[in-house]
């Protein structure tokens, strides 16, 4: 199973989204909420309260 790059929640096979940056870095996201917070808004997961510790 894959793990979300933002909230570290397990992602079921066949769900979620894989995001590849131009430099080759691969991110996996469980939801659009996680994707937007990391990519678009540039938030750091450890500073967001709803992310698992």
From Swiss-Prot:
Q: Which CDD domains match?
A: Ribosomal_L24e_L24 (cd00472)
Cofactor note, please? Binds 1 zinc ion per subunit.
Positions bound to Zn(2+): 4, 7, 30, 34
Keywords linked to the UniProt accession: Metal-binding, Ribonucleoprotein, Ribosomal protein, RNA-binding, rRNA-binding, Zinc, Zinc-finger
Per UniProt, the C4-type Zn-finger stretches lie at 4-34
Q: Name one Pfam family in it.
A: Ribosomal_L24e
Molecular function in Gene Ontology: rRNA binding; structural constituent of ribosome; zinc ion binding
Its GO CC terms are:
ribonucleoprotein complex; ribosome
Cofactor names: Zn(2+)
Q: Which InterPro entries match?
A: L24e/L24_sf (IPR038630), Ribosomal_eL24 (IPR056366), Ribosomal_eL24-rel_arc (IPR055345), Ribosomal_eL24-rel_N (IPR000988), Ribosomal_eL24_CS (IPR023442), TRASH_dom (IPR011017)
- Respond yes or no to whether keyword Chloroplast is given for this record: no
Q: Which SMART domains match?
A: TRASH (SM00746)
Keyword flag rRNA-binding? yes
Query: Which GO terms of type biological process are on file?
Result: translation
PROSITE patterns hit by this protein: RIBOSOMAL_L24E
Tree of life domain = Archaea
Q: Which family does the UniProt entry place this protein in?
A: Belongs to the eukaryotic ribosomal protein eL24 family.
Question: HAMAP family per the record?
Answer: Ribosomal_eL24
Q: How does it assemble?
A: Part of the 50S ribosomal subunit. Forms a cluster with proteins L3 and L14.
Outline what the protein does.
Answer: Binds to the 23S rRNA.
Name of this protein: Large ribosomal subunit protein eL24
Organism name: Methanothermobacter thermautotrophicus (strain ATCC 29096 / DSM 1053 / JCM 10044 / NBRC 100330 / Delta H)
- Taxonomic lineage from the root: Archaea, Methanobacteriati, Methanobacteriota, Methanomada group, Methanobacteria
């Amino acid at each position: 199973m894959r793990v979300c790059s933002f909230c570290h929640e397990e992602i079921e096979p066949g769900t979620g989204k894989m995001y590849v940056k131009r430099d080759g870095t691969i991110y996996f996201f469980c939801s659009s909420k996680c994707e937007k917070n990391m990519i678009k808004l540039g938030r750091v997961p450890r500073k967001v309260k709803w992310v698992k510790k």
